[in-house]
Design a protein with these regions (language model features):
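Gly/Ala-rich beta-loop-alpha elbow adjacent to hydrolase catalytic centers
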Residues: 111-116, 120
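The feature captures the conserved acid-bearing segment of alpha/beta-hydrolase catalytic domains
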Residues: 140-219
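Serine-hydrolase catalytic machinery in alpha/beta-hydrolase-like enzymes
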Residues: 12-14, 19-101
Length: 224
């Protein structure tokens, strides 16, 4: 597995590459996620397909990954609703660069943890560029999300969903709806998607790199 760093349109990108990758994973990451990338890649060593993973920098998590504006759920930082700008970067800059490196026929899948998982689901309602979505503990509690996704279908055919089995016990009443929301999201996808819902032991803030690795590896096995 080779690792390299480069900058694209003002964003740092970390690229991991197997020999002759057949699938390419895209993952938005903040500083904490970046520190865990090596461990995530190690947890993916038994993936069904040789792969590449491009992790791209997100500096303002709540602003850049939220599909529309929403008030703060915890703390004082609101959601800025700039996901469309982030998706523009992916479609207009990152994918063309990666096609140049790996060829036009490589399969792209998008995924991430928490709000990045929600971004991945949302992005797949806006474009058919992705073969799969790996949404590990996605923030499907986000205000307005369930109404939106009932009217806007995920275009990727393979979707992985997961949640920690203690996440729906959150003290925050909005975040505590995540269990009901993930079950409803799963039910919506069952009719015409290859989809799974995995329950992980524990709360939201643990094993994010292992959970994300499992999400990507399930996608690799499903789209292969």
């Amino acid at each position: 597995m080779r690792k390299q760093h480069f900058e694209l349109d003002g964003r740092a990108v970390t690229l991991y590459t197997d020999d002759s990758p057949q699938i390419l994973f895209l993952q938005p990451v903040d500083e904490h996620d970046t520190e865990l990338l090596d461990a995530e890649i190690e947890a993916m060593r038994d993936c069904a397909l040789p792969f590449a993973l491009a992790a791209f920098e997100v500096r303002d998590w709540n602003r850049e990954l939220s599909p529309w504006e929403a008030p703060p759920v915890f703390g004082k930082v609101p959601f800025g609703g700039m996901a469309q700008e982030t998706l523009f970067f992916v479609l207009d800059h990152l994918l063309p660069d990666l096609r140049t490196r790996f060829g036009a026929d490589i399969k792209f899948c998008i995924g991430g943890y928490s709000l990045a998982g929600l971004f991945a689901l949302w992005a797949a309602t806006r474009t058919d560029a992705f073969s799969g979505v790996a949404a590990a503990s996605p923030s499907v509690w986000f205000p307005g999300w369930m109404d939106y996704v009932k009217e806007n279908s995920v275009q990727a055919k393979a979707v992985y969903l997961s949640l920690g089995d203690r996440e729906e016990r959150a003290k925050n009443p909005l975040m505590a709806t995540v269990g009901d929301c993930i079950r409803e999201q799963y039910a919506l996808l069952q009719a015409d998607h290859s989809v799974t819902l995995e329950w992980n032991p524990g709360s939201h803030f643990q094993d994010s790199e292992k959970r994300t690795a499992r999400a990507f590896c399930w996608i690799a096995a499903t789209v292969s």
